[in-house]
Swiss-Prot record:
S-S pairs: 80-115
Keywords: Cell membrane, Disulfide bond, Glycoprotein, GPI-anchor, Lipoprotein, Membrane, Signal
Signal peptide annotation: 1-26
Major localization class: membrane
Protein's organism: Arabidopsis thaliana
Name this protein carries in UniProt: Early nodulin-like protein 17
Gene: ENODL17
Glycosylation (residues): 42, 73, 88, 101
Listed CDD domains: Phytocyanin_like_1
GO cellular component annotations of the record: plant-type vacuole; plasma membrane; plastid; side of membrane
PROSITE patterns: PHYTOCYANIN (PS51485)
Protein family (similarity comment): Belongs to the early nodulin-like (ENODL) family.
Length: 172
């Protein structure tokens, strides 16, 4: 009986894992790719073509003794002014993450002078786009073929697999 319970549990878990999961995951961007957060890199070009969505992360790698990550307003961003940051994202390790948890424009710069060498990044964070609409399923009567098939196959498989397992295990 214990094997039967374990088998039922395994089958149910297999079905749950095989079920389609929403394709919504946060993405981690390493700022500057393999050049990281350093002077003389054009971060505007790095950000081009990327879509930043709510929940994504910006991962900064830098020398913590020479640089930092400050969030500022647009005016301070344009003038490389770090006197009144909105937020200091630096945690001291030189491996810091900015979580994009609001739909807004983020203006980030190095407040230790690196901004004048190009160490500034502006990203616009958007809401996730809606999932693509699936193709319409032809209905037969009031129940679609796919729904009817799923309603039939899941209960049948829940009982068929354990029965097959029992037969196979008795043969050995």
């Amino acid at each position: 009986m214990a094997r039967f319970t374990v088998l039922i549990t395994a089958v149910v878990l297999a079905f749950l894992m095989a079920a389609p999961m929403p394709g919504v995951t946060a993405k981690k961007y390493t700022v500057g790719e393999n050049k990281f957060w350093n002077p003389n890199i054009n971060y505007t070009i790095w950000a081009q073509g990327k879509h930043f969505y709510l929940g994504d992360w910006l991962y900064f790698v830098f020398d913590r003794n020479q640089h930092n990550i400050l969030e500022v307003n647009k005016t301070d961003y344009e003038g490389c002014i770090a006197d009144h940051p909105i937020r200091n994202w630096t945690r001291g390790a030189g491996r810091d993450i900015v979580t994009l948890n609001q739909t807004k424009h983020y203006y980030l710069l190095d407040g230790k002078g690196g901004c004048y060498g190009g160490m500034k990044l502006s990203v616009k964070v958007e809401k996730l786009p809606p999932p693509p609409k699936s193709a319409p399923v032809k209905n037969i009567g009031s129940v679609s073929m796919v729904t009817g098939l799923a309603q039939f196959m899941i209960p049948v498989s829940l009982f068929a697999f354990p029965a097959m397992w029992d037969v196979i295990s008795r043969m050995w």
